[in-house]
Amino acid sequence: MPKLRSATSTEGRNMAGARALWRATGVKDNDFGKPIIAIANSFTQFVPGHVHLKDMGSLVAGAIEEAGGIAKEFNTIAVDDGIAMGHGGMLYSLPSRELIADSVEYMVNAHCADALVCISNCDKITPGMLMAALRLNIPVVFVSGGPMEAGKTKLSDKLIKLDLVDAMVAAADSSVSDEDSAKIERSACPTCGSCSGMFTANSMNCLTEALGLSLPGNGSMLATHSDRRELFLEAGRRVMALTKRYYEQDDVSALPRNIASFKAFENAMALDIAMGGSSNTVLHLLAAAQEADVAFTMDDIDRMSRQVPHLCKVAPSTAKYHMEDVHRAGGVMGILGELDRAGLLHTDVPHVAADAGGNLKSVLAKYDVMQTQDDKVKQFFMAGPAGIPTTKAFSQDCRWPSLDDDRREGCIRSREFAFSQEGGLAVLSGNLADNGCIVKTAGVDESNLTFTGSARVYESQDDAVAGILGGEVVAGDVVVIRYEGPKGGPGMQEMLYPTSYLKSRGLGKACALITDGRFSGGTSGLSIGHVSPEAAAGGTIALIENGDRIEIDIPKRSIKLAVSDAELAARRETMLARGPMAWKPLSRQRYVSMALKAYAMLATSADKGAVRDRSKLED
């Protein structure tokens, strides 16, 4: 049987000092020998998705200790991408993912914890903790803070649903009055929780369910609803069950690398494509797969994007549905159930919600609202919003009058009635992106599935924003924002402001945007990101000139710079002649801290998940 990792610091005369310190944290004589469960919390008052997490660790700890474990909590950092947006703060967002992963690894390994509960929520926190959990490969359960309720307000006597992006677009639209803009801003984010649409945070929390590492409802149950409390308690109980299975029964199926297998990554990607998740999820799944030593690549994503239909359309792709509506329709388990009936899901994989010997099939039998016979499960998915602004978790217990089980015209569709037979994300490739790039097709209007336009090139997001607002960009342009990749930014900024401002100026369907940076989960429109290789790594995007014709064909998965090979070769020679300034922006003025320079030295392009280049670290 595997020995408890914590025995390293709790057994033997040579560990008398360590035991003395453990005692000072509250450990008693009869506690030694029990498994020590680390609780990685990410509470912070900076982030609405985390502002309510302060007491969640205590909830989980109570369940752990009741089940026979010792619970020890620590915190990680958490960056709010929305607050960091539009200024130099966004340079720190993606690099914070690596810091979070490292900090969890450091704490767990330094203190020899036996298992782990990850309390996450927003954009880089769930991916960072996921990377750490797969790196550590000890029993783990994820439980997130949950999504906020959708904003709601009346404009022109019409009640509308809102989110963060609506506030940004309205503020930049000169046709919207100051009064209406302020009204939208005050209504857009009414409660604690991750932003209410299918943005990056909610997408990633949904994907942990599909990977098998979190409980049903984790991705969709509102932060404000009292039912969410049980998820935290059950996370504590489940991690103890997994811990006992591994350390007492030598059951390796309880370990995250055996749960998050290649099949599980395919399930997660199938879910992502079906629900039109944030394009950032591609970046994070690729990074997590590398930590798990799973050979899941852009080629797999490309293949699956052609097979999996788009079954669930949620804000920002539509104003009609938000996460509260996804939950009413059955949440992640509802979407997975439809994928299963379409023959597009592996159900023979382990899941933390399954008992020993169980798998995803047994979890779906209980939690898919279209097949369950459990009235408690149906009540669980009827949990709805209260419409009361609050920063408190579990503050309301409102319920919808019924489930949304309409698979023809509801929030979640069956394959037969899918929004489209090809999914909500696509991988494009061509001479402009030799290693691929990503477009969130769920947010692209049908009229823009093919697009040809003239390049309007900017070497920073700031310059692009100034150009868009200053009238430089006109209908038919393809806005190219380069040197914003993981290495070139550094930090791979999100481009939510440029896409929002294109919309506010009436160019949302008249222009395309291409970048080696990335997009917020709140982005929609013909926005193509993650261009690889990035400009700073010698990618063709660095060679584009103003006026070049760019051809985009999403159905054919193609993106082409209509410039001859000979001309591109000549431009490449000219670039190389710059010497030390080759593959660097000439006009951009940007302060880059030592911390960001250190990140850039090891960063890979987006097709590798923007993780560290291991070849530079190996002996």
UniProtKB/Swiss-Prot annotation:
According to the UniProt entry, its GO molecular function terms are: 2 iron, 2 sulfur cluster binding; dihydroxy-acid dehydratase activity; magnesium ion binding
What PROSITE patterns does its record include? ILVD_EDD_1, ILVD_EDD_2
Q: Where does Mg(2+) bind?
A: D81, D123, K124, E494
One GO cellular component this record assigns the protein to is: cytosol
Write down the InterPro entries for this protein, in alphabetical order: Dihydro-acid_dehy_C (IPR042096), DihydroxyA_deHydtase (IPR004404), DiOHA_6PGluconate_deHydtase_CS (IPR020558), ILV_EDD_C (IPR056740), ILV_EDD_N (IPR000581), IlvD/EDD_N (IPR037237)
Keywords, in A-Z order: 2Fe-2S, Amino-acid biosynthesis, Branched-chain amino acid biosynthesis, Iron, Iron-sulfur, Lyase, Magnesium, Metal-binding
Identify which top EC class this enzyme belongs to. lyase
Pathway assignment reads: Amino-acid biosynthesis; L-isoleucine biosynthesis; L-isoleucine from 2-oxobutanoate: step 3/4; Amino-acid biosynthesis; L-valine biosynthesis; L-valine from pyruvate: step 3/4
Q: Which Pfam families match?
A: ILV_EDD_C, ILVD_EDD_N
Which cofactors? Answer: [2Fe-2S] cluster; Mg(2+)
The record's catalysed reaction(s) read: (2R)-2,3-dihydroxy-3-methylbutanoate = 3-methyl-2-oxobutanoate + H2O; (2R,3R)-2,3-dihydroxy-3-methylpentanoate = (S)-3-methyl-2-oxopentanoate + H2O
Q: Which Enzyme Commission number(s) are listed?
A: 4.2.1.9
> What binding details are noted for the cofactor?
Binds 1 [2Fe-2S] cluster per subunit. This cluster acts as a Lewis acid cofactor.
Could you tell me the Gene Ontology terms of the biological process aspect for this record? isoleucine biosynthetic process; L-valine biosynthetic process
Positions binding [2Fe-2S] cluster in this chain are: C122, C195
**The protein's assembly and partners:** Homodimer.
Q: Which family does it belong to?
A: Belongs to the IlvD/Edd family.
Question: What does the UniProt function comment say about this protein?
Answer: Functions in the biosynthesis of branched-chain amino acids. Catalyzes the dehydration of (2R,3R)-2,3-dihydroxy-3-methylpentanoate (2,3-dihydroxy-3-methylvalerate) into 2-oxo-3-methylpentanoate (2-oxo-3-methylvalerate) and of (2R)-2,3-dihydroxy-3-methylbutanoate (2,3-dihydroxyisovalerate) into 2-oxo-3-methylbutanoate (2-oxoisovalerate), the penultimate precursor to L-isoleucine and L-valine, respectively.
Name this polypeptide is given: Dihydroxy-acid dehydratase
Q: Which organism is it from?
A: Shewanella sp. (strain MR-7)
Q: What is the lineage of its organism?
A: Bacteria, Pseudomonadati, Pseudomonadota, Gammaproteobacteria, Alteromonadales
Gene encoding this chain? ilvD
